[in-house]
Amino acid sequence: MSRSRFRGRITGWYLMASSSGEKLDWCGCGRPPRIVVLGAPDKLNVSSAWKRLRPTIQSHAELIAADFEFTYDFSDKEVDLVIVIGGDGSILQSARQMGENQTPVLGINCGRLGFLAALSPEDFLDAWPKVCQGDFSIIRHLMLEVQLIRDDEVIAQSMALNEAAILNGPPFAILDIDLYADGELATQYRCDGLIVATPVGSTAHNLSAGGPILRRQLQAIVISPISPHTLTYRPLVDSADTRLELAVTEPNESTSIVVDGRILGQLKSGDRVRVHRAPVSFEMLRVPGQNDYRTLREKLGWSGRLALRQL
C-alpha cells in the first residue's frame, strides 16, 4: 500500500511529499506513524545523514515535515514521533521547540558525545522497521519550569530539560544565593553559581561541578553549587515535586539565570528565580538493547580498565 501527501512550503521549513511501503500498524492505529524530522541546519554531517536515512524513514512512515531550522509549529498537527538528527544540543532544542506539545523523540547521534541522541545512523537503520511496528518503550523524563520574577511579576519563563543555573559574571565576585524549598529557607550558599538539574541534566554541567549522576527515570532533582566557598556545601538530591526559589543578594552586572545553555535573563537585586516541575514530560523512545548503564559505560568510558600506552 502506498500513499503520498504534499502540503506545500512554509517559511522556515518544508512539508514533504511522502510515501509508505508496506502498511505498518503504529501502536494499534492501523496506519504508519506520522513523523517530523528535526536537525541542526549548519551541520554538514546532519545533512549527509538525512540524505542517507530519508529513503528508509519514508519507506515505513508518513513524513509530515523535515525541519532543519527548528521552526515547525507542533500545535498545528498531530505528530506521532519526532526524529532528531544531530547531538544532544539538537535534542534540547527540540524540547524547547515542542513546548507543551511534547511528542516522543528518537535521537540519531551525529554529534560528539550523544547521551540523549544515542543511536548511530547504522543502529537506526537496523532499529527503524521494528520501531514502526511498535518494538520500543517510551521513557518519560522530568522537565522543569523556570520563572524569573521581578517586582512580583513573571518577566521571563522557560522549560528546562537539563538544568537551570545561576551563573556568575564580571567582575566575578562570589555570590550569596539564598535557597528556599517549599517556602522555607533551606540554606544560604556562597559560591560562583548554583545548578538545579534534572536526571537528564545530571550528566551535563552538574557532573562537571561534582554533582551525582541520577537515573533518568528518577523523579528527582539535584542542586549543585559551583565552586562553593565552604566545603560542607555539597550537592543535594531532592524530590521533583519540591518547589524551589533562588535569590541572589547582590548579583554582579552580568549574573544571569541560564536555562539549558540559554540566558533567560540577567538578575537584579531583589529578583527571584522559581524552579518547579513542568506540567509536561520529555518523552524518549528506547529501542531494545538500550539502557542507562550501557550509555554510561560507552559515553563515560566505564568499560573497565584503561589500556596503558607503552612509552
Curated annotation (Swiss-Prot):
Highest taxon of the lineage: Bacteria
HAMAP family given in the database record: NAD_kinase
Cellular component GO terms, alphabetical: cytoplasm
Function description: Involved in the regulation of the intracellular balance of NAD and NADP, and is a key enzyme in the biosynthesis of NADP. Catalyzes specifically the phosphorylation on 2'-hydroxyl of the adenosine moiety of NAD to yield NADP.
Pfam families tied to this protein: NAD_kinase (PF01513), NAD_kinase_C (PF20143)
EC annotation from Swiss-Prot or TrEMBL: 2.7.1.23
Family in the record: Belongs to the NAD kinase family.
InterPro entries for the chain: ATP-NAD_kinase_N, ATP-NAD_kinase_PpnK-typ_C, NAD/diacylglycerol_kinase_sf, NADK
Protein name: NAD kinase
Annotated compartments: Cytoplasm
Main location: cytoplasm
GO biological process: NAD metabolic process; NADP biosynthetic process
Coiled coil feature spans: none
Molecular function as annotated in GO: ATP binding; metal ion binding; NAD binding; NAD+ kinase activity
Catalytic-site annotation from UniProt: D88
Membrane listed as a keyword: no
EC class: transferase
